[in-house]
């Protein structure tokens, strides 16, 4: 049995909602968008075919963010997305123009002042083990959290 996980973010606001929404969709996430008193908000969640949080990479082609993928995805997915982009731009693909970046570093640059993103992933593999992790992102920093490690830290400090 394979690992199964569910991912959920809080609501947050970014500079370019359309771009972030497109990139999250390319990673297989559902994205909800709404207006809260004139402020565009969005959140994302899993559709069971999305990337695992720890593997999310943003693929750039010629400096333009194209697709979010994961290390375990077939390179063919990346090239297909870049081919589609190049076809629209009517240019040939130059492999030297492909770069990747941790998606959450990119997301940091998109956050509006005072905004933070909290994303959790909870999963299991045939209930043989369970896991929980998350990432908290602000404009200045992001940090990973592991549920098991955080619980053990609490126990160690309080027993």
Residue ranges and their predicted role:
Residues 36-159:
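Charged interaction segments
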């Amino acid at each position: 049995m394979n690992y199964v996980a569910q991912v959920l973010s809080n609501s947050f606001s970014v500079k370019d909602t359309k771009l972030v929404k497109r990139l999250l969709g390319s990673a297989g996430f559902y994205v909800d968008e709404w207006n809260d008193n004139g402020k565009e908000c969005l959140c994302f969640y899993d559709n069971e075919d999305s990337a695992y949080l720890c593997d999310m990479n943003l693929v750039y082609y010629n400096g333009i963010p194209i697709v979010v993928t994961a290390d375990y995805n077939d390179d063919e997915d990346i090239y297909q997305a870049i081919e589609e982009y190049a076809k629209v731009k009517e240019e040939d693909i130059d492999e030297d123009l492909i770069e990747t970046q941790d998606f959450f570093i990119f997301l940091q640059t998109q956050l509006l002042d005072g905004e933070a993103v909290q994303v959790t992933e909870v999963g299991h593999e045939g209930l043989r083990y369970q896991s929980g992790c998350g990432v908290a992102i602000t404009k200045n920093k992001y940090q990973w959290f592991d549920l098991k490690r955080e619980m053990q830290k609490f126990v160690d400090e309080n027993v």
